[in-house]
Amino acid sequence: MEAAPGTAAAAAKPAKSCKKYRMGKRHANIYTYQEPPHSNSDEDISEEKADSQDPEQVFQNIQYQKEVMSNIRCRPWPMRQKLRVLRQAKEIVLKYEGRLTRTRGYQAAGAELWRKFLRLAYNFVVLFIPWEMRIKKIESHFGSGVASYFIFLRWLFGINIVLTIMTGAFVVLPELLAGAPFGSTVSKTIRQEDLKTAQDLDTIWSLGGYLQYSVLFYGYYGSDRKIGKAGYRLPLAYFLVGMAVFAYSFIILLKKMAKNSRMSLASASDENYTFCWRLFCAWDYLIGNPEAAESKAAAIVNSIREAILEEQEKKKSKNLAVTISLRIIANILVLLSLTGSIYIIYFVVDRSQKLENNKRELTLWEKNEVSVVVSLITMIAPSAFELVAALEMYHPRTTLRFQLARVLVLYLGNLYSLIIALLDKVNSMSVTNSIYSIYQVSNNSTPSSATGTPAKEDTLSATISDAQMNSSESHAQSLPTAGSLVNNTASSNSAQNQCWETYVGQEMLKLSIIDMIFTVASILLIDFFRGLCVRYLSDCWCWDLESKFPEYGEFKIAENVLHLVYNQGMIWMGAFFSPCLPAFNVLKLIGLMYLRSWAVLTCNVPHQQVFRASRSNNFYLAMLLFMLFLCMLPTIFAIARYKPSLSCGPFSGQEKIYDIVSETIQNDFPAWFNSVIAYISSPVVVLPALLLLFMLIYYLQSIARSLKFTNNQLRMKIQAERTEDKKKVVQMAVGQNLVDIPDDQIMSDFTQNSEGTRFQSLDGSDKRPDKDGGLISQESSVRASTPRKNGSVLNFESPVSKGTRIQTISQTVPHAVPSTDVARPVNTTPTTSASLTPAPSVSSAQKPRNDHTTNRYPSVVHGSASELCKTKPYTPVTFKKRIGDVHSEPLFRKSIRQVNPDAFGAGAPVFVGRRPHATRYFIVNENEPRKKSARSTSRLQRQFRIEEPEDIVELYPCNVRRYVVQTPQCMYSPHPSEDEEDEEALGRHYVKRSHRPRSLSDLRPAPRFYIGDRADGHVLTSKVHYKSWDDGFELDLDRPPYAYKKVHLKNVEADQHYLEPQVKPKTKHMLEQSLTESDSVSIESSSDPQNSSNDQYIQVIHSKEKYLKPGTKLTKKKSNTNIELNMSEPNELVCSNV
């Protein structure tokens, strides 16, 4: 049976590195070409060999490729493979030979240095990421949910840094450097009455005095269109920077959300192999710090806890009616809380305005009651929401999102109620400014001491001080109105106090300061002092304070995240009226980072329900985007609705704040540009542009929906495939396929047609394996690891196809099988006869055919087809231990030279080169002489395969050239078992005796492993080193022959243990006789000698190489070069079931 010529390159072999290739070149005269296990082409190896940038390695690779090109004719490869390797070698030489020049070498060295510099620079920049190690430490102990808060805080810190640079560089610094100095104008001068209390704590706390007339607020900036020698347009810059703050915030938020969305779509789902990935792939082997290792271990434990909670939440059963009722009650309570908080804030703001109108001097509480009440509601309400959320019984992540949404609504309600009350105050101040402007006009037309007579119609009586005379007397002006009479009494110098933009900025900054104070107080009271009480009073208290009330504090993710959103909303809302508010927020966030991180690591404990946070944190960003939009609306409304103050600010004298843009275009730009801007801002252009934008948004949204749908379909497909793989693995693990197969079907599969390149599946259909990938695909499953009762077939398969496989399957045959059924002695001359074809089923029996088929090698028949077909069903083999721990030594491959065949007799192992590629089964009857060449049956089905043999060494008769075996160092167990001690004792007994090889007929049968590439070859079951006699091999006489290799089967224990027999030297003319007497000069049955005739084997041989030419005799096989041995991987040892 001859294999196809291309099958030699089909099976994948173990990959070798470039270094191993070069070592093989030095120690061998012919270079072997092997492919990596997962590659079917030679390009990967060539690129791997030639990709090195080292000139020395490039030179060695080029020399190697040139040697390959020169010796390509001598290699036993198919022509297609030779042409492919030759073409690739030429390409590599042409591509990399130019690198050996001096210029190319300098360029390569410079490029390598530049890459190293960039890598070092990147590592250096990473060191400057703020608070990275602190956040990693928190994440390792408290999980990704708590760490997401600090990551979000750091990101907000970066945004505020940019906002501070924008306002500072374009607004604050130009005003300080080129604007009017302090005290030069009315808006920058403190009244004489206020100088006495300007430095009092009460005044500073209310942001009055010197703070009011500083760059912190809007009123300090001058209204000059151009300042300094360069003519810097400060009013225009103030307006554009105010708008740029909102634009930049929108852009950076949307960009971050888009990036996170792409990352979440590109990332794999964590629902598959959750615990395996965390258990086996989570450790970072680059950790060299004990503290970092401890943090990483804590992080792995936390991630496993998160995964366990995820699985528990999926399986939790719920009562639908009770759950819906509780959720309705919880939402009603939340709505009542929100309504009450909004009413309280509006009530406090209205009361504060009345007190300001009625009382001349306000107390400290009356000045700050609005900010204090807002901060108290902000601190208390989230805890109430958390108690309500416990009724809903949502998943922890869903609970967090509901909690975030409710707290967000609370904060927005607080801010909007505050801003509405402030806008009412702004409206009244705008009315006062209008009255003051009317008074100025009328005062210019009449003497200052004149008193107007009120008319009979409704009049507006206003008492306004004369700012020009700086006196305390009041002048009554009668102004006709269509409404009611309003009396507004203003103190002296009221024009300076009626700057509503400064008032809004003061309220926002005051609210931020008080919020920071309450945050620090809550951390100290709720976390620190609470932790101290629990820690030191738990021993002397009536109950356990750690497990019951008050317990240690837990880090509330929803409350703290929304607090950051609320704080940033205040900054956006007041940034236009207080340019230094982002700078203050930077300092606040720095303090909050250190204080919160210290409190978490010192005072808090991890949440009882640790859960995984969202990987992208897009929910946080979506809330922040929503807050940005809602906080931008009041500012835009105030800019568009109210007239700017007349006596303060850069827009004084303008009808609207945004008029500064049109004024600048009219005065500072040419006329054609003004006309273009007017045309672009007309409805003729604006409306079509808006329609086009809407259509574009709809189109992009449609594409996004379709891509999202496709992504979900692909994700479901991947998940389905993984589920199928899991099912297959489970079925293979329990041996479901093998258990369900009846015995007669197994026998019919063992007796298929003997075509080497075809195999028949269980459904009867013939299938030809693929030339390249068939072997790998056929070997890719893992079978049952325990013996089955319907046949002693142990199936262990490696996922990678190996070059040579031998599998032995044992079964019990009846005692009445006559010895005449066994084949006759070997006839070394091929004859023309039909091959041994076993019957296709158990019921069909035929006579054994002892003749040879032409073009077939002489081999030994281990049994006949009739014996196989007449056997009883499989009987289980009793193992005392599993076949799991089979120790073997590393695989060493050396060149082998020819030695004298009679140097050590026939017992010495004989090795030949690679054998033909085919799958062959040999029926082995243990105590019967092997006389006839076996005929190959077809390849076994995948469910009947056994683990690949551990080591494969081929032994051949004396008429073939033989090579000497060098003994490796054996691996002994530090605690030998009783059987091993008996073997060692018997070994010491052998040392005292002569080391002359004995006849096999004098030895007791021993358990053997049938591993080999040919049926007529002798088999060694040990890992061996090969060394030629000329290289200095010396026989170790201190060890008995049986101890040259000791196979440690820790989990395999046969019914009886025997020593391996010594092999007696034979001459060439005694070959046939030795084969008859000693069962092919190798091994007898491994069971009891009395029942050894009942043991029958099917020896399965997979060989990768091509057949030799027809008619070639092994006795005339010459080897002019060193022969490469067919060795298997170290994980291919198979124990035969006896």
UniProtKB/Swiss-Prot annotation:
Residues 753-763, 777-795, 804-813 have a biased composition (Polar residues). Expressed in a range of tissues including cerebrum, cerebellum, retina, cochlea, lung, liver and heart. Also expressed in the apical, medial and basal portions of the basillar papilla. Keywords: Glycoprotein, Membrane, Transmembrane, Transmembrane helix. Residues 1-15, 828-845, 1074-1095 have a biased composition (Low complexity). PANTHER family: TRANSMEMBRANE CHANNEL-LIKE PROTEIN 3 (PTHR23302:SF35), TRANSMEMBRANE CHANNEL-RELATED (PTHR23302). Belongs to the TMC family. It comes from Gallus gallus. It comes from the Eukaryota. It is a multi-pass membrane protein. GO terms for cellular component: plasma membrane. Residues 1-20, 29-54, 753-859, 973-1005, 1065-1095 are annotated as: Disordered. This is Transmembrane channel-like protein 3. Residues 1-155, 224-233, 349-369, 423-508, 591-618, 698-1138 are cytoplasmic. Residues 764-773 have a biased composition (Basic and acidic residues). One of its GO terms (molecular function) is mechanosensitive monoatomic ion channel activity. Residues 177-202, 255-327, 391-401, 530-569, 640-676 are extracellular. The chain crosses the membrane at residues 156-176, 203-223, 234-254, 328-348, 370-390, 402-422, 509-529, 570-590, 619-639, 677-697. Probable component of an ion channel. Residues 989-998 have a biased composition (Basic residues). It is found in: Membrane. Glycans are attached at N272.
